[in-house]
């Protein structure tokens, strides 16, 4: 294995663990489940690792958190949704990285918005269609919007700080 591949695998495992821990440690219970800081780590995984490594790190870490927290019925949806959050953020960031320009805070936040729209709609669809909760799944939308906003702000702050490290 090349050193770069080993580095990516180690970082992916670290981000999976960070996604899991950030989801489980800071849990704010709500009627629709819980709000957590895992969203920040999912976005950051995509931005740092790129689309596919980020997809698997975010999906596995977040899915593991759901499993360990007793929400096993959410694991398949969480794996896909959180993986897509990282994948979309990474794909939208890629063209800006190729230009080599400094990316301002607001632009990073805008890049992450589509990922969070997928998260909010993804969980609504999963709860409504797969788990059979119908329109009552809409009750989780405000909670997910708050989680998305917190995730965007924190991940942009962390990414900006990390991008200054050589």
Model segments located where?
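Loop-helix junctions at membrane interfaces
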Residues: 1-166
């Amino acid at each position: 294995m090349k050193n770069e591949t080993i580095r990516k695998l180690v970082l992916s495992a670290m981000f999976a663990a960070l996604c899991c821990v950030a989801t489980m440690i800071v849990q704010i219970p709500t009627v629709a489940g819980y709000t957590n800081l895992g969203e920040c780590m999912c976005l950051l995984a995509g931005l740092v690792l790129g689309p596919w490594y980020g997809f698997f790190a975010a999906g596995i870490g977040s899915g593991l958190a759901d499993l360990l927290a007793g929400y096993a019925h959410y694991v398949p949806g969480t794996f896909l949704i959180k993986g897509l959050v990282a994948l979309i953020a990474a794909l939208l960031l890629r063209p800006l990285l190729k230009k080599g320009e400094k990316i301002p805070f607001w632009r990073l936040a805008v890049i992450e918005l589509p990922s969070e729209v997928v998260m909010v709609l993804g969980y609504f669809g999963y709860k409504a269609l797969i788990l059979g909760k119908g329109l009552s799944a809409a009750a989780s939308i405000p909670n997910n919007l708050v989680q998305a906003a917190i995730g965007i702000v924190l991940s942009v702050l962390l990414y900006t700080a990390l991008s200054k490290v050589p």
